[in-house]
């Protein structure tokens, strides 16, 4: 009878005896990891190229606006106008970041590992949604802070700094509105497929292909249809809320009329709230289905 040839090696594994962190710690870890992932941090150099290219563009635009404005003594662009003008970049940022946040985990099949921990099914998508919204708000808010610092340091007194601060706060709130709406829509689309290319294409299609619908509605022979046209696209929906709440911040040219919302400003806000709520509800339903597999 041959002797057994197997050898047992003690490689030093030990049972974990530290504190067991609960739901809040897991949620926080997912959130922080999601924000880092959106900007390519902790990933390969290739994954960092596009996010930081977008960051570089928005910061360069903010720096140029600040420098030119200080030279000519005029405000080239308000903080709210900056968020509007960068919205097209935000679309592509969402199209890249959202699939990285959720599609990769769906395709690799690691979600059962997440849900085996003390993490309710709803916490995973909510942490990802909050992370994406934070990343988008930082993307639009950080350049506004650059513009604010440039204007504050070129001001004559503290009164000018205070005026700039009062202009900055609505701009940051407006950036937050962009972030919440775009994150909710983008993450829902990305969560529908495990293939990142399909998710990215779907996000771009939803945001860009709804714009022609707005154009068609705006030329119909109906004043109500014209005034409500903006609700057909996420981008113009957010812009409509901005026009309703801070028209003087977005339309600074006295000769420019801007979109006419009539008395439908509150309708835009209601539709945006319902859109975000619907996206969140569908996102939670999607992950309940995934967890039940």
Q: What do the predicted segments below correspond to?
A:
Residues 100, 104-112, 184-197, 280-293:
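Cytoplasmic membrane-interface segments at the C-terminal ends of transmembrane helices
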Residues 126-127, 131-193:
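Secretory targeting signals
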Residues 63-98, 103-104, 249-271:
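Membrane-embedded or membrane-proximal helical elements that form or frame transporter/channel pores
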Residues 57-61, 135, 139, 143, ...:
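Alpha-helical transmembrane segments of multipass membrane proteins
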Residues 45-67, 88-94, 203-210, 274-277:
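Hydrophobic alpha-helical transmembrane segments of multi-pass membrane transport/permease proteins
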Residues 197-291:
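Terminal transmembrane helical anchor/hairpin motif
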Residues 2-49, 285:
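Aromatic- and glycine-rich beta-strand/loop motifs that create alpha-glucan
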Residues 101-134:
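Helix-loop-helix units of permease transmembrane domains in multi-pass membrane transporters
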């Amino acid at each position: 009878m041959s002797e057994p040839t197997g050898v047992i090696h003690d490689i030093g594994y030990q049972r974990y005896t530290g504190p067991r962190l609960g739901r809040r710690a897991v949620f926080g870890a997912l959130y922080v990891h999601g924000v880092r992932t959106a900007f390519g941090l902790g990933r390969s150099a290739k994954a960092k190229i596009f996010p930081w290219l977008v960051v570089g563009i928005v910061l360069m635009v903010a720096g140029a606006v600040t420098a030119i404005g200080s030279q000519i003594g005029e405000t080239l662009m308000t903080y709210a106008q900056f968020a509007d003008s960068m919205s097209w970049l935000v679309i592509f940022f969402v199209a890249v970041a959202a699939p990285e946040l959720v599609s990769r985990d769906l395709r690799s099949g690691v979600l059962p590992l997440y849900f085996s921990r003390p993490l309710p099914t709803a916490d995973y998508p909510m942490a990802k949604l909050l992370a994406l919204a934070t990343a988008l708000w930082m993307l639009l808010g950080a350049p506004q802070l650059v513009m604010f610092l440039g204007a504050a340091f070129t001001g004559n007194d503290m009164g000018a700094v205070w005026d700039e601060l009062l202009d900055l706060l609505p701009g940051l709130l407006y950036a937050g509105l962009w972030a919440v709406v775009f994150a909710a829509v983008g993450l829902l689309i990305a969560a529908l497929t495990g293939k990142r290319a399909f998710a990215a294409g779907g996000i771009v299609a939803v945001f860009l292909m709804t714009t022609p619908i707005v154009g068609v509605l705006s030329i119909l022979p109906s004043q109500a249809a014209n005034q409500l046209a903006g609700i057909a696209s996420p981008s113009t929906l957010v812009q409509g809320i901005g026009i309703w709440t801070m028209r003087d911040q977005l339309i600074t040219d006295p000769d420019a009329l801007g979109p006419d919302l009539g008395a439908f400003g509150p309708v835009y806000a209601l539709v945006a709230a319902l859109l975000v709520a619907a996206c969140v509800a569908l996102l939670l339903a999607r992950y309940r289905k995934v967890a039940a597999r």
